[in-house]
Structures are given as C-alpha cells and as structure tokens.
Amino acid sequence: MMLDANQAWTASEAISRTRMLEPFWPYWMEEPLISDDVLGHSRVRQALYTAIAIGENIHSKFEMATYIHSGAVDIVQADAIRMGGITEWLKVAHMADAFNLKVAPHFLLELSGSLLCGVPNALILEDVEGGSLGDLGLLEETMTVEKGLWKPSHRPGHGILFNRDALDNTKVRA
C-alpha cells in the first residue's frame, strides 16, 4: 500500500494519521506536507516507521539536496520535467544513491522508465493514467508494460519516437 497525502497535512497530522495506518505496513507515505516544509518532513520521517516519499514538487537538485541532507526523505520521486530535464534528474538520482536512497520518478512513464534503466538505485516506475506521452497521443509508437514490467525501447538514448504532427498541434504562439 502506497499512500499519498498530496501535501494536505501538518506535521502533527501526518504523524498521527500515518501511525494509525502503520499496523497495515504501508510501503510509503507520499508528500504528507507542503513541499517546502523540509523541517516538518524531517520531523515526520523521524517519528514514523513508514518511508517518506517526496520529490514531484521539488524543482532543483539544490532543493532535493536540502531534503536529503536534512534526513527528510526515504524515497526520492524526482520529476525530470519539473526538475529541469534529464541531466538534472540524473544528478539527483546519483545524489540519492550516494545516500543509499532509492528513486521512484514521478510522471511520464516513457521518459522515467528510460531514466530508471540508467541508475543503480531504481525502485519503481509510476504509471499515472492519462499522464504518459502515449496517453497524450504524442508518440509514433507507444511503449508497453507487460506482466508489471516496463519494456524499454530498442532505440538509443531515451528511445522515445515522437509523433511530429501531434507535437505541431501542441504549439502555442508566444
């Protein structure tokens, strides 16, 4: 059971509510507090047996470093799109690995799956319905999940083959 509070609680609420669920051994509690409350997350993490997952609303390696150094996170859920791209995501994943933390990236199955293939501390790939490039109709060829395993592309790099016509339809005039 993986729980997500979507930044809804105070530290005290997160501790008391998660403690009520701990007899059921939840795997993690995701985003229990607003994302800029590093000290609160640290307090929550120290008070619980349940792992704390955070990262989808953290936007740089510097913000994530603060979480990691403060002992405020167990599972890093960095989002390559929100964090500044592939290079920034990889820096965060390797920083997490240096502190023996696993990564479970947020959003965009196709890109996140490829990134997980390149790091030693990969944990799990999230598949949000409606939140993949394939679901958005932006791919020539969708990537598949079979028996719970994501199948990476045989193409080099991230392996994503975009549908150029679909991308043209997303242009915005500035």
Where are these regions (language model features)?
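Catalytic core of soluble alpha/beta enzymes
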Residues: 1-106
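Flexible C-terminal active-site loop/helix
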Residues: 106-174
